[in-house]
């Protein structure tokens, strides 16, 4: 009887031991670091002199917001000229008037030819003039379309000199100032703070127990009210042999930028 109870106790302990890794996993608390989701060095695609820079360190920016302008007085003048040309209607209007007149003249001459009032050659001349007027009108219409395209080209050349923010975020650093050359140098450095990125180095004991999509609580070193929840987005498939750890990345929503980047934290899976 006693041996039977011993066997039952041993079986129970083995069962509890088998369940231990899951309990350890669910209670795992690890050090982590909260970082910007991304850092972007914003530069100009062309060399030139900065005309103005509209942001300073700490400014909040929206995607598409103008950050700076590269000097573009020549391009602005070219755009104004192109717009003026595109608005001109005189060539098309005069071409239409000449064609209408040539058509009427052909009709009149053909009638006179039937009455033997003019020669065949005069009718041919009027027909040729009509055809030339039609070609001239088509050319004027083509030039009008080209003028519109020239406006688009000039506007695109000017837009290239307008440096816009590629993200919603905050200005970490203003690197260049007005009148400085943009040659291969970032103008401003931006950080995207919503969402944030949480970096963790987990021990190999958790390998296979942390997976993409898993939720985790993040406790920053500075209280922010409540415990935000992040989700695992990356689990490294290569282990660092020297430290016996592997990298885990989580994505932490940060509406209103209530959490600053750069904080140390604890993460609980």
Q: For each predicted feature, which ranges?
A:
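Short beta-strand-turn/beta-hairpin segments enriched in glycine/proline and small hydrophobics
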Residues: 28-45, 149-165, 188-192, 233-239
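Low-complexity, intrinsically disordered
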Residues: 214-229, 257
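Short, compositionally biased
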Residues: 74-90, 202-207, 231-239
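Bacterial N-terminal signal peptides that target proteins for export
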Residues: 2-16
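Edge-of-domain interaction segments
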Residues: 206, 221, 239-241, 247, ...
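Amphipathic alpha-helical coiled-coil/rod segments that serve as protein-protein coupling scaffolds
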Residues: 62-167, 175
């Amino acid at each position: 009887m006693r041996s039977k109870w011993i066997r039952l106790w041993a079986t129970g302990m083995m069962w509890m031991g088998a369940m231990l890794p899951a309990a350890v996993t669910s209670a795992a608390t690890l050090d982590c670091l909260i970082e910007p989701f991304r850092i972007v060095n914003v530069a100009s695609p062309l060399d030139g002199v900065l005309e103005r820079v509209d942001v300073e360190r700490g400014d909040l920016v929206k995607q598409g917001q103008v950050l700076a302008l590269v000097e573009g007085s020549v391009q602005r003048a070219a755009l104004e000229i192109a717009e003026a040309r595109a608005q001109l209607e005189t060539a098309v209007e005069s071409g239409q008037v000449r064609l209408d007149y040539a058509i009427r003249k052909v009709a009149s001459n053909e009638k006179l030819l039937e009455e033997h009032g003019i020669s065949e050659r005069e009718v041919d001349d009027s027909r040729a003039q009509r055809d030339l007027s039609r070609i001239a009108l088509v050319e004027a219409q083509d030039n009008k379309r080209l003028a519109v395209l020239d406006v688009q080209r000039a506007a695109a050349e000017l837009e290239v000199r307008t440096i816009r923010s590629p993200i919603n975020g905050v200005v970490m650093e203003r690197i260049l100032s007005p009148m400085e050359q943009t040659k291969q140098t970032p103008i401003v450095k931006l950080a995207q703070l919503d969402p944030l990125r949480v970096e963790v180095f987990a021990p190999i004991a958790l390998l296979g127990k942390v997976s993409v999509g898993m939720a985790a609580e993040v406790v920053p070193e500075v209280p922010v009210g409540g415990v935000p929840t992040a989700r695992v987005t990356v689990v490294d498939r290569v282990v660092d042999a020297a430290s016996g750890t592997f990298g885990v990345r989580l994505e932490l929503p940060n509406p209103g930028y209530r959490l600053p980047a750069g904080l140390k934290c604890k993460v609980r899976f």
